[in-house]
From Swiss-Prot:
Keywords: Cell membrane, Membrane, NAD, Quinone, Translocase, Transport. It holds the Pfam family Complex1_49kDa. It is found in: Cell membrane. This is NADH-quinone oxidoreductase subunit D. It comes from Mycobacterium sp. (strain KMS). It is a peripheral membrane protein. NDH-1 is composed of 14 different subunits. Subunits NuoB, C, D, E, F, and G constitute the peripheral sector of the complex. One of its GO terms (molecular function) is quinone binding.
Length: 446
């Protein structure tokens, strides 16, 4: 005679000391709390928040073990957005790789592209040969991108806490920046505009006046956002003292970005390890000593103002000049004056290389189909993205394709802090803690 199996959550055996795990998912919070109150001694409740939950910043899964409404254990489940970008880079030439990396952290594509291109240029040994106009445009686009990314962080964080007005304000301002990106690169996201050795094309006519209009518009709009949230009683109650992580915790976990600077440490790669000429720009590294979600909010708001200062300096420094390295053996074969798409595909350019120079046609064909050859070696480069240190470890075997490219994405590293921030707190406060980290799952899973 066989004994029929009991229900999956039938309770533990007190004689053997085993615990019963009650897994609750997709139910109302009242039912979750009621189940916790009715749980017998020795029972645990594990709640799956995500990966489809609207308050987990994308396809992030939080596995929360709770007692009542208190989190006793928190773990992250990732990998739902894995796309194999790093592996795909090994099957594309060095220039084509830009179109892949720009899609990782999709809220800060210019940082992905710049970090990749800085690594390629360092392997080639041409970092000092990059035209000044290229570096100025790169810095300008990255700082505009920093503002747009922080706006999304504040907008989505506000939405998750019930501040719908903050979401409307944030996305309204972001649209203004994305319209500038679309004017310059042709796309709102996934630009592939920054290339090894330079840029895909020069700034179009009307881009600089449009950026100046943006510089005049955004300060007032940011002031409206600050007036809405800075002294808002409910906002402060939901963020002050929430998601606490001190300097020792950040150093132990390798945390960077606004989370690290909220402990009072002024660590910013733009100052610590300048790149693209950042040492020539005047700006402040914003810090706070709250170590909580509210401090990280204040840092992001103030960093947007510093980014506006840098963009204004970039506009003043823009001088006519080339936007691609002069070495024709390394430069992507494009006549940027004739090729409006930056790829040398204009009829006038094609007619010239095909009708006047057979050698030029052969060079064009070989460089486009095979790509540039990068000397064997390995290098690590890093930039300060909106979320922290975005690093790239590149390995070249001397061929036309990368042997290995690995990204150190700050969202991936910073998610290690979820347990330290959430355990011992309330379930509702986990939303504030994760929002203050601002993870982008495209960068986490890659």
């Amino acid at each position: 005679m066989t004994t029929p199996p009991g229900p999956p959550n039938a309770g533990g055996d007190a004689r053997t000391g085993t615990d019963t795990v009650i897994v609750v998912g997709g139910e109302d919070w009242e039912q979750v709390v009621a189940a916790a109150e009715q749980a017998q001694a020795g029972e645990r409740i594990v709640v799956n928040m995500g990966p489809q939950h609207p308050s987990t910043h994308g396809v992030l899964r939080l596995i929360l073990e709770i007692e009542g409404e208190t989190i006793t254990e928190a773990r992250c489940g990732i990998g739902y957005l894995h796309t194999g970008i790093e592996k795909n880079l090994e099957y594309r030439n060095w220039t084509q790789g830009v179109t892949f990396v720009t899609r990782m952290d999709y809220l800060s594509p210019f940082f992905n592209e710049t970090a990749y291109c800085l690594g390629v240029e360092k392997l080639l040994g041409v970092t000092d040969a990059i035209p000044e106009r290229v570096n100025v445009i790169r810095v300008m686009l990255m700082e505009l991108n920093r503002i747009s990314s922080h706006l999304v962080a504040l907008a989505t964080g506000g939405m998750e806490l019930g501040a719908m007005s903050a979401m409307f304000y944030g996305f309204r301002e972001r649209e203004e920046i994305l319209s500038v990106f679309e004017m310059i690169t042709g796309l709102r996201m996934n630009h592939a505009y920054i290339r090894p050795g330079g840029l895909a094309a020069d700034l179009p006519d009307g881009a600089v006046p449009r950026i100046r209009e943006l510089l005049a518009l955004l300060p007032g709009r940011l002031r409206d956002l600050e007036n809405l949230l800075n002294e808002n009683y409910i906002w402060k109650a939901r963020t002050q003292g929430i998601g606490y992580l001190d300097l020792a915790g950040c150093m132990a976990l390798g945390i960077t970005g606004p989370v690290l600077r909220s402990t009072g440490l002024p660590h910013d790669l733009r100052r610590a390890q300048p790149y693209c000429g950042y040492e020539d720009y005047e700006f402040d590294v914003i810090t706070d000593d709250g170590c909580d979600a509210y401090g990280r909010y204040l840092i992001r708001v103030k960093e947007m103002r510093e980014s506006l200062k840098i963009v204004e300096q970039c506009v003043d420094r823009l001088k006519p000049g080339p936007v691609m390295i002069a070495d024709k053996k390394l430069a992507w074969p494009a006549d940027l004056e004739l090729g409006p798409d930056g790829l040398g595909n204009s009829p006038a350019h094609i007619a010239r290389i095909m009708g006047q120079s057979m050698e030029g046609l052969i060079h064009h064909f070989k460089l486009v189909t095979e790509g540039i050859r990068v000397p064997a070696g390995q290098v690590y480069t890093a930039v300060e993205s909106p979320r922290g240190e975005l690093g790239v470890h590149m390995v070249s075997d001397g061929g036309t394709r990368p042997y290995r490219v690995h990204y150190r994405d700050p969202s991936f590293t910073n998610l290690q802090a979820v347990a330290a921030m959430c355990e011992g707190g309330m379930v509702a406060d986990a939303i504030s803690a994760v929002a203050s980290i601002d993870p982008v799952m495209g960068g986490v899973d890659r």
